[in-house]
Amino acid sequence: MTEETAPVAPQRFGTRVRSIHGDHFDDPWDWLRQRDNPDVIAHVHAENQWAEQVCKPAQELAENLVSEFDSFTAPVVYSAPQRVGDWWYFQRQYHEDSYAKHYRVSASHYPDTPVLTDSETLDGEQLLLDENLCAQGEEFFKVGELVPTADGRLIAWSQDTEGDERWTWIVQDASSGDIIDQRVSDAGYGFAWAADSQSFIYTRVDDAWRQFQLMHHHVGADADGDSLLLEEPDEAYDLWFSASNDPWHVVVHSTSTTSGGAWLWDPYAPSVPPRPIVAKRDDVQVNVEPAGDHLLVIHTALSREGSLACIPLPQEGAADSVVDPDHWVTLYTARDGERLSDLEAYRDFFTLSYRRDALPQARYYRRTRPLKVVNGKPVPASDCSDLWTLGEELNKEGTIRSLYPLSSGRFEDCLVRVGYQSVLTSPTVEELDLRTGKSRILKVTQVPNWDPSDFTEERVWVTARDEHTQIPVTLVHRRDAQPDGTHAGWIHGYGSYEVSFDPEFDILRLPALKRGVVHAIAHIRGGGEMGRAWYEDGKKLVKTHTFTDFLDVANYLVDSRWVHPERLIAEGRSAGGLLMGAVTNAQPDRFAAVIAGVPFVDALTTILDPSLPLTVGEWEEWGNPIEDPEIYALMRSYTPYENVREGVRYPAIMATTSINDTRVFYVEPHKWVQRLRQATSQVPDQSPIVIRTEMVAGHAGASGRRGRWQARAQEFAFALHQVGITK
């Protein structure tokens, strides 16, 4: 095998020339952006063939990994049932299936939440949707949401058959399965039924894949006649919403990464545009949750880590329905080390999600006075200052555990439902009955052939190079492993958009753990693990903190002798792929192998082009290099594609992408791979650079359980081979 056999895309200067802030760059490979060009598609196919050839020595290991993923999968994986109206809705995925099946069972048979098992079916259960049948003949298939009507007559579900996250909504008769409507396409995320189950609202995306319109659709009508209820003209903002537990209100948000506003839609008057309730304010984020007779809101007007407040409902017929912040009643403000994040409200209680000690936590609040309903509508609360008790913690014992409140279904339920998991703890759902104080386990994901007691999971804190910042790290390894400097290691990171990379269970990690690989999740700045301040200390002009934190954790793994200096694998996806490119440019000899999934490695080109999807909104994350020379210079110094080092040996790299990815275009990693091969002093047999492209998929990669297994097994086998694990 020689490097010359790797596909070479010719350089074509003049395709994209950049001159800005005194800097000039002529991009020789930007022509690969032309997806309709036969030369581009031929090149992509050639790269796939080359990757297959390079990975042949690891093919047996990849096949073994798929078999092991299969062995760790229970005969049936199921969800905890959720109540909507008079039915319990749930799903199962059988061992032999790539996709789930959706069911329901009458609540008349099961007044309390039914507990599913691997071997038993429920009395009177009905199959609503078999995704496996729907996926037949499709190269890519994904169901987004399935939403039943309150009366149980209809279900609506969204599907994507391209991987571009432009959804088609399908409405079926729940009893017969007959399709009634599939006219709504090019939809974004979000769906809510009108109270009469005759119509629904959804979001529409523009050419830049921004959710910019709120639409109202009558079931059975032509989608061309759908009503526009709300439009967000500012390209920095996206509209989003989800159905509420509260049956009388749905909150529609418009948010950027720093601020937002909110509107209130009435399902009983579905054709009426939503009323504004919270006006946008610079640098103030809001997350509003309806609670029947008032609203709850998490906002950042008082603290960047969040405050919890009550908001009165806007008065009917009032000319101005925006609620003055002076009338908000503060219930709680984040303490040091906390970050308030989300709400889930019911008639008699609500749950508050927050972060503390780099982990998701939760507490619940009980209502002190009953909700009053007159003529089928809630009476607005005149005073909510003493409407709620002090919060009670829901957190589970354990050093490392991610805990999330889950919806139980009905607004009138007195059931607090939480899910929790960790790298070693499989997903578990528990339900607390507030009437009795008793709790019970609704679901524990079974994992055959796996004993978590053979491993240990701990939190360590790594001192950053500034000598005072403490970086949290989740460290997992075999219980019998010692820090003797011999082990292979695998470090994961993300560090952008205030997204938290929490310790969660994934059977795909298990084969490497059983082979003695030490796993580390670096909870670096730019992510949300330690709150808003942690995020802001890793964006815009201090973005490089994200990269140096990751390198400091990687160096710690070697210096502490948990990992052999030549056996460390690094992995990141999307913005985490930018991280992979930046850290390999900075310290290429630190890693033996790098997996860069859908990597954002041509960041500067993208952020300089407002016509590309998501770019305008991204300026709040990265800064605006068009207007700000300092931001331009900083991004120019770290964008991976433009900073590959000449004549230096890099680690083995596998980049993956999808031709239909709307978030990170396939062209970015393809350009990066060409530049890496041209500039670096690689020894192909020892440290190959390859790229695999899914021809029908999106940002999340291949669809279907087994499709994902096969794709990930190829990545894992490639990386493990580089650190001497070949079986």
Annotate each predicted stretch with a short phrase:
Residues 7-49, 66:
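Mature N-terminal segment immediately following signal peptide/propeptide cleavage
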